[in-house]
Amino acid sequence: MTLLGSEHSLLIRRKFRSVLQLRLQQRRTQEQLANQGLIPPLKSPTEFHDPRKKLDSAKTEDSLRRKVRNRSDRASLVNMHILQASTAERSIPTAQMKLKRARLADDLNEKIALRPGPLELVEKNILPMDSSVKEAIKGTEVSLSKAADAFAFEDDSSRDGLSPDQARSEDPQGSGGSTPDIKSTEAPLAGPLDTIQDLTPGSESDKNDTASQLSNQSDSGKQVLGPLSTPIPVHTAVKSKSLGDSKNRHKKPKDPKPKVKKLKYHQYIPPDQKAEKSPPPMDSAYARLLQQQQLFLQLQILSQQQQQQQQQQQQQQQQQQQQRFSYPGMHQAHLKEPNEQMTRNPNSSSTPLNNTPLSPVKNSLSGQTGVSSLKPGPLPPNLDDLKVSELRQQLRIRGLPVSGTKTALVDRLRPFQDCAGNPVPNFGDITTVTFPVTPNTLPSYQSSPSGFYHFGSTSSSPPISPASSDLSAAGSLPDTFTDASPGFGLHASPVPACTDESLLSSLNGGSGPSEPDGLDSEKDKMLVEKQKVINQLTWKLRQEQRQVEELRMQLQKQKSGCNDQKPLPFLATTIKQEDVSSCPFAAQQASGKGQGHSSDSPPPACETAQLLPHCVESSGQTHVLSSTFLSPQCSPQHSPLGTLKSPQHISLPPSPNNHYFLASSSGAQRENHGVSSPNSSQGCAQMTGLQSSDKVGPTFSIPSPTFPKSSPTVPEITQPPSYEDAVKQQMTRSQQMDELLDVLIESGEMPADAREDHSCLQKIPKIPGSSCSPTTILPKSSASFEQASSGGQISFDHYATDSEEHLEVLLNSHSPIGKVSDVTLLKIGSEEPPFDGIMDGFPGKAAEDLFSAHELLPGPLSPMHTQLSPPSVDSSGLQLSFTESPWETMEWLDLTPPSSTPGFSNLTSSGPSIFNIDFLDVTDLNLNSPMDLHLQQW
């Protein structure tokens, strides 16, 4: 709840006061302070206080000195096992610990540098591999060893002049997780690799340990890259090897090579020789690791392609056994030639597209046209002549991976040479109509198990709603939208072009090339899914069409009725009767029949329709308080809101998910052209008394400011939204209504003078009453049936004629009430009688008018099944209660914020009172008592 400025300062003041009160309660007494020596004693003079302080400090000092003197020596502490027995200095053990840590880190680095690569694991049969892969590995070993020699020669020059210990301590840092050559033990390399080989016999067992652990990680060779990315420190191996390695390291002889090569750094090398040299010196082990990784990636791609080809063959065999579904040709006449055949690549399932789930819901095709707007052109017969960049471009167009060598790229493009004759449908041709239906509301609009719909083409696009591209603005739908319509019979446009049709045509057998393997079952699933989505959409469209038809009928009736009718008296509203199915709020009924307040209602009451709330009644037809429902699922063309010469409303039942209840008031509306908030609706509870006695009681009634005496049950009170949000929502609602009226007048749905008629509505005066929520049902209780405070039941016509002058006085611009927008509700302290509090604020004549109007207005209320009872006069808080969603559009100015606190719900209600909003600035309104209580709770 957003607080206004004065309330905010009041709140802060109260908070500070409560904190100060707590501090005062908890502070120590003077006796306690004197006992602790913080202040001088109360009775003794201050001269004695200083010597006493000095005495205390001297005592503590003495006790500390005594403790230090009596401290036990080091030998006794060693005997008691408090200290370790070490005769040496204390700096020696710390130096030893540092050495040990450094040695362990060094060993660990060596182990990481010498761990086996993936190819070694394959060689030693730790990772399972096919025989073809092993042969490929053997073929690449020769080239690998040559490349490693070249790198090693460069390495010698940089490593000369260093002791072998330094060289080897640098090596693990430089190689950073590198692995030795596959055949490093069999084909020894020159240079520092000799120093590494001195360790290989000793660390062979460690290699096997790490290899076995790594093989446990990789699930039977599927995640073969796991060992590369997750180096595992083997702690047991480190502990066992730490001592032996440190001894070996210090005993090694120095490098026997001559030191003359140092001059190589200072020699002049001509530029022509520089160009012939190998790439800049890189660590040989790291270069080998990169080559191994590249090889391994290629091997992975090969094995994946082999696996998927085998899977496709199996699926093909299964499908030959199964019976194929045959779909009758539905749109053979409309089909375009290019769409009859879709290019389907048998190897396209081996591309990474299958691993990337596409989002199944897109509003338009902008996403995929960017990807596949280029038509894959015909490939040249000789792919080897193409450059690598051209090959990559072709692969990009087809959505294939572009990494790898030129031969790999050529191999990937080979299958596309065979089916180059079959054109792929151009996705630029596809026309879609985006329905204003959110996909989240469709229960069947979900992706298939693999995360996306499998289309035949290699660039698999998400499903396109097969909608007609020329829906008229009036909402009339083509006749083909029927339940019995087969799969894709939803096209009203003469040239529909959708991928669904091309899919169907390829299923119909009209296409030349044979179907790809393993796609039939996927297509069947996809078609079933699409059928569900289509049924859902047709249902939604039928609902919208029905609503539009109802609106049109109602508008015509109201137009024809407008010319005949006399201008209705005050508070009269035209009500339409609807079936039970159009009620959006399925509110239950209170048990029993309503108490008949209107057995003596005169016949003229039948002329003006009875004002009853939106409810479901058990006896056939329902009288409906027509209110405007703006469903977010309806486009503006589909929800025409007509406002005609008498205050009339249109009822448009929304979808069950969106209860936006905007009750149009027929009273004066400020900027809102056509929709006013429920809170500012006119107080017309008098009319509810006119319902016939055989009808069941309504679900809610709108209490008017006519001060009835009642004590209805009070539901729990919730917090209203903030004032700024309410004002913003009001502004947007009025803008929406203006736009709707413009659209309707342009399309010819409404006469051009509807805007003037609409502005005429604002001349009718109104009294704002507390609004009611249609969703809460309260138990039936005898107290909820109000008795009229005046003598008998006053009929509607009598009330309308008699009280007009008093209403004029009430709403007069000279009275302190002022405009309708300034009217709000006020709670008055519990001690005062109902009218004493506010009558002080009015001048004498206005007070008399108010009282006479109060006596004239009858106030029987029908059974109060409401969430908002009339605000009380005899209570210490204003009763307010709202459900969050329907009431977010309320004008919260009309409620006094300070007293709508959740602490006071059990209140007896008499009647509200009306006052000028300028009174909010007065501070002596007795608004503080509930605030104090609320702050203490807070």
From Swiss-Prot:
Residues 153-205 are annotated as: HDAC5-binding. The modification Phosphothreonine is found at T896. Residues 717-938 are annotated as: Required for interaction with and ubiquitination by STUB1. Abundantly expressed in the heart, aorta media and bladder, weakly expressed in the stomach, intestine and lung. Signal peptide: none annotated. GO terms for biological process: cardiac muscle cell apoptotic process; cardiac muscle cell differentiation; cardiac muscle cell myoblast differentiation; cardiac vascular smooth muscle cell differentiation; cardiac ventricle development; cell growth involved in cardiac muscle cell development; cellular component maintenance; cellular response to angiotensin. Smooth muscle cells (SM) and cardiac muscle cells-specific transcriptional factor which uses the canonical single or multiple CArG boxes DNA sequence. Acts as a cofactor of serum response factor (SRF) with the potential to modulate SRF-target genes. Plays a crucial role in cardiogenesis, urinary bladder development, and differentiation of the smooth muscle cell lineage (myogenesis). Positively regulates the transcription of genes involved in vascular smooth muscle contraction. This is Myocardin. It comes from Rattus norvegicus. The lineage of its organism: Eukaryota, Metazoa, Chordata, Craniata, Vertebrata.
